[in-house]
Amino acid sequence: MLSGITTNRLMDSMDALDTILKMQREYMEMIDSRRIGERREERISKLCTAIIHEACELQNLTNWKWWKSPSIFDEEKAREELIDILHFVIQISIELGMDAKDILSAYARKNAINRERQLKGY
């Protein structure tokens, strides 16, 4: 069991992640591959740039600009921007040859490291 997650819930999560990976692969088949780049490193670099820009779009929905009058936070738009980021993160996972099991395993490993750091006052 992973941090209190039941086996059934873990399998459901894996199925959901598999579905997301499949949907992303199918979506990328629709895009002219020459637009994103020939080399894997180039594709990953462009995807990282896309993540940065989408993260800025998400940040712009918050009231981080102290010099401007605050606006109402649009949670629905924020969710949309977050999913845009997820598209690019999932595509990088695919570029790195990761499947749902690889993603979960790497996440669990890094999560354990982060938890240990917190326990040590990081």
Model-found features: residue ranges?
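Flexible "arm" and connector segments at domain edges
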Residues: 1-122
